[in-house]
């Protein structure tokens, strides 16, 4: 079983990594093509394109200028440890052991507007480029056109390498939109996490993002390979709802937050 999650806007390059193992991103030639285009934008153009403050636009213009494809532990960090946000709070990889990282490296992928697909231990230099950014490029009008079917092909290769055909979607719609389902040679299992609010179960963004990270953590820590075991997920008060679920749509409910 292979999982996909979204990246995060918030990055942490200050905290020392808890593992010294690392790998190199597999698709840097594509990332470099995007970087070369981003370098042509002024901070004002970046601000308008990405709807960023002047300060953040300036920061990312500097990031694009200093980005170069020779990644080392001195100028980059493992992607799973560099991303910070609700999903990664739930995943909490900071307390992983080496065996956890090894399993994650085989069974987890992070989708990225710049890097396409990242493995957990892939070194990553800091950036800001959300998948939904309408960055016109040589391949089309936006990043979905830029990546085309490549991300699906790379996920197929990862699945083939582990001899499996199940893809667990823990990514947002924005990011999973870059995955062409028809090109996948896999059964896709979607997930929903709902919390009780005002008498109804609803998807609350903050909690749902964190729950997606907790589900990824559960799969990694339990070394889960059979999707049937996903129904046993019960972290922080969530429980499987057979009534609201379908064969490839797993719904988890929670009656009260526990965090």
Curated annotation (Swiss-Prot):
GO terms for biological process: response to hydroperoxide. Belongs to the UPF0246 family. InterPro entries: YaaA. It holds the Pfam family H2O2_YaaD. One of its GO terms (cellular component) is cytosol. This is UPF0246 protein PA3539. It comes from the Bacteria. NCBIfam families: PRK02101.1-1, PRK02101.1-3.
């Amino acid at each position: 079983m292979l999982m996909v999650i979204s990246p995060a806007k918030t990055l942490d390059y200050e905290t020392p990594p808890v593992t010294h193992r690392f790998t190199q991103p597999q698709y840097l030639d594509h990332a470099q093509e995007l970087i070369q285009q981003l370098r042509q934008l002024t901070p004002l153009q970046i601000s308008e394109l990405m709807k960023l403050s002047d300060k953040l636009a300036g920061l990312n213009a500097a990031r694009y200028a200093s980005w170069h494809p020779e990644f080392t532990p001195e100028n980059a960090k493992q992607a799973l440890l560099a991303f910070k946000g609700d999903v990664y709070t739930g995943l909490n990889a900071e307390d992983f052991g080496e065996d956890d990282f090894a399993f994650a490296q085989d069974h987890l992928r992070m989708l990225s507007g710049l890097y396409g697909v990242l493995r957990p231990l892939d070194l990553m230099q800091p950036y800001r480029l959300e998948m939904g950014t309408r960055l016109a490029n040589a391949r089309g009008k936006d990043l979905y056109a830029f990546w085309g079917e490549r991300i699906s092909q790379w996920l197929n290769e990862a699945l083939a390498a582990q001899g499996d055909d199940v893809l667990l979607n823990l990514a947002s719609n924005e990011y999973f939109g870059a995955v062409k389902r028809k090109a996948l040679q896999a059964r896709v299992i979607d997930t929903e996490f709902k919390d009780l609010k005002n008498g109804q179960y609803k998807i609350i963004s903050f909690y749902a993002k964190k729950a997606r990270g907790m589900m990824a953590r559960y799969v990694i820590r339990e070394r889960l390979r059979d999707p049937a075991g996903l129904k046993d997920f019960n972290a922080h008060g969530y429980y499987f709802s057979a009534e609201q679920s379908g064969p490839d749509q797993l719904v988890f409910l929670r009656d009260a937050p526990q965090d």
